[in-house]
Design a protein with these regions (language model features):
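Active-site-adjacent structural elements that line small-molecule/cofactor binding pockets in enzymes
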Residues: 1-295
């Protein structure tokens, strides 16, 4: 088992201690440091800062939102950071949700699984540099079709100018639903589950065969050292209430749906209802201790 440190993203105030955290994690033998993004700090920039001050620890996004960048941009950022860090970068990606992608980035959420598969395919092609990149997927065609709206009709297939340090930069996929989880096992080097319960493997419909050698499951496990169990669970419950209650629309929240599949449907709906009605403290207290402790 490898240990990683999840730094996440900025919340109400910028967190400026990421370098000291990374250095301590590296000195303690941690394998990796992970950043995330929502609609505050981005996932890549903090890793550049960390990479300049460390030498061994892996630098990983967990996750970078697919709707925020084109596949080519993701490939360029991954290649650049991997090269500058001496081959330490891991690209963790995920679809996020329609509320953020359409409300913040102004992009259609569309068919997320198909879009994810096309994105991974394009990134692989770009990094391999076998030939100028083309893609005929319905969601992310390359070049942009000449007959598409607002097209100038001048796009042509291009190939990455420079040779990457590693053409096989590992890709991890953040996934909660069975189809997306299956895609992670089929196309990626690792799976990033947001909530994972080892006692409920049937929830995730994990494959029993054809798993890639060295495939990794990078699970977030929140640790809070304290004397009181209820106090220790409170921080976890606050995070869960935010995601289950507010990180998605009332009609479609992937985190709420996952909690429901884990046997907490009424509790999940109650948390969401309280959170969206402005009763955030009540939403936190509505998260069952058993659920918070399980994951």
């Amino acid at each position: 088992m490898k240990l990683g440190a999840q730094y996440g993203y900025w919340t109400r105030e910028p967190k400026l201690d990421i370098v000291s955290v990374a250095l301590e994690a590296e000195n303690l033998g941690y394998d990796s440091l992970w950043t995330g993004e929502s609609y505050s700090s981005d996932a890549f920039t903090p890793l550049c800062w960390v990479g300049a001050h460390t030498s061994k620890i892996k630098l990983a996004t967990g996750i970078a939102q697919l709707g925020a960048r084109t596949p080519a941009t993701l490939a360029m950022q991954a290649m650049t950071l991997d090269t500058l860090s001496g081959g330490r970068f891991c690209l963790g990606i995920g679809v996020s949700g329609p509320q953020v992608i359409e409300g913040w980035h102004g992009q259609p959420f569309g068919k997320p699984i198909a879009r994810t598969k096309e994105t991974i395919n394009i990134i692989r092609k770009i990094l391999l540099r076998d030939e100028p990149v083309t893609a005929d997927g319905p969601n992310l065609p390359l070049p942009y079709p000449k007959d598409a709206p607002n097209s100038w009709g001048l796009g042509k297939p291009l190939k990455l100018i420079n040779k990457p340090l590693r053409p096989d930069i590992p890709i991890y996929l953040g996934a909660e639903g069975p189809k997306n989880i299956a895609l992670a096992f089929e196309e990626c080097e690792g799976w990033l589950p947001l909530y994972y319960s080892p006692s409920r493997p049937e929830i995730y419909q994990l494959p029993h065969s054809k798993v890639k050698e060295n495939f990794e499951i990078a699970v977030n496990v929140n640790v809070n050292i304290c004397d009181n169990i209820s106090e220790g669970l409170f921080m976890q419950k606050a995070i869960l209430a935010f995601y289950i209650g507010g990180m998605g629309a009332q009609k479609r929240n992937f985190h709420t749906e996952l909690m429901a599949r884990m046997g907490y449907e009424s509790e999940a709906n109650n948390i969401q209802s309280l959170f969206l009605s402005g009763k955030r403290d009540e939403a936190i207290h509505a998260v069952p201790d058993s659920f918070a402790d399980e994951i």
